Amino acid sequence: MKLSMPRFDQAPVLVVGDVMLDRYWHGGTSRISPEAPVPVVKVDQIEDRPGGAANVALNIAALGAPASLVGVTGDDEAAESLANSLKAAGVLARFQRIANQPTIVKLRVISRHQQLLRIDFEEAFNTDPLALSAEVYSLLDGIKVLVLSDYGKGALRNHQALIQAARKRGIPVLADPKGKDFTIYRGASLITPNLSEFEAIVGHCEDEAQLVTKGAQLMQELDLGALLVTRGEHGMTLLRPDQQALHLPARAREVFDVTGAGDTVISTLAAAIAAGEELPHAVALANLAAGIVVGKLGTAAISAPELRRAIQREEGSERGVLGLEQLLLAVDDARAHKEKIVFTNGCFDILHAGHVTYLEQARALGDRLIVAVNDDASVSRLKGPGRPINSVDRRMAVLAGLGAVDWVISFPEGTPENLLSHVKPDVLVKGGDYGVDQVVGADIVQAYGGDVRVLGLVENSSTTAIVEKIRGQG
């Protein structure tokens, strides 16, 4: 399955569910309390992060998608902390604030990157479902996906009304379910239980075949569009009616903390589906995202650059020969890491020492070097009959093997203006003894503030001379 980065900026998502605040007390531990055999933590940092449905919305916004959130809080400082964090992240949050009841807070005590204790401050909310529904209905017409983030804390009491309202508008509904009654999610487009939650409904599964069979029965009973079972270190399994099960292995390189991993899965799924991705592609992206987030401490979001880099690793496009879509993805990721992009182009028909020196000098002007190579037809037009000596695939393969070169791409035109307009490199480099104003594409690069450099050629190094010498000896 070929992965690519969706257009998240065109994917508005609404999250409805149980909002909570994840609070962290960080500190050092160097002694045992004289009062009891427990460690003493000297707190030196207090950190608040959105949790539950708020973390789902935060993850969606971190990917670059427009995110809205409807939930229930108390009327207290924890609610203010949540509201401020979400506003800073660009999430449109609408809270139903309940007086004389605390916002749900999960307090974790952390020392040396280890969680020592969790303390929960919570009471199940007894909310007015009609008031919450009114907020949701007012936002439905501007979204592409509705997410029900259910932690069983009382914010969601009218699942069916919300699902039916979204379905009437043709809006997919994704639900992260809780509890032992999944009938409340009847008619959802997709539900995402973890294996424990799934088996609490259908019974223990001896193997994957039994999981698939029981999952198919559950989908039929609940009129579900699809079912995604997340299985920890065993990855995840996607089931759809009348289609073969899709098993995806876990992508985590190192598991550090699984807090909020389910939130990351459903948020990435929602944003990708809202961006128009097919479900298998969206699930593959969610699997990559989950592999990233479990390597972080505590409740965390993944950013668009992090997901881009994971896609690059998956597609093998961190270096080498790329198509335009892959190249733009790689360039976006490099820019997100504040790397300077250098671009040069040429025929590179017979690679020689002069080319190698030139490319090393070009690479030294930035952090990443793109080499654009004329394809065979354009070389023939430029150099005449009998050229190129080497096909474009062979020329690019040799260039990609050089340590100075990050990415190689071919182009069919005689000049690289079209590529330059798409890539917008920070530096355009050419070899020769002419002025900057004579460099093809200089006007394009200079128009957006880029730099144009001309490097001197290495003496007695010429592909044309090499070709003529070989032909003369022949």
From Swiss-Prot:
Region: Ribokinase, residue numbers: 1-318
Record-annotated active site: 263
Disulfide links within the chain: none
Catalysed reactions listed for this entry: D-glycero-beta-D-manno-heptose 7-phosphate + ATP = D-glycero-beta-D-manno-heptose 1,7-bisphosphate + ADP + H(+); D-glycero-beta-D-manno-heptose 1-phosphate + ATP + H(+) = ADP-D-glycero-beta-D-manno-heptose + diphosphate
Gene Ontology BP, a term: ADP-L-glycero-beta-D-manno-heptose biosynthetic process
Enzyme class label: transferase
Known pathway: Nucleotide-sugar biosynthesis; ADP-L-glycero-beta-D-manno-heptose biosynthesis; ADP-L-glycero-beta-D-manno-heptose from D-glycero-beta-D-manno-heptose 7-phosphate: step 1/4; Nucleotide-sugar biosynthesis; ADP-L-glycero-beta-D-manno-heptose biosynthesis; ADP-L-glycero-beta-D-manno-heptose from D-glycero-beta-D-manno-heptose 7-phosphate: step 3/4
Binding positions for ATP per the UniProt entry: 194-197
Highest taxon above the source species: Bacteria
Function: Catalyzes the ADP transfer from ATP to D-glycero-beta-D-manno-heptose 1-phosphate, yielding ADP-D-glycero-beta-D-manno-heptose.
Name recorded for this polypeptide: Bifunctional protein HldE
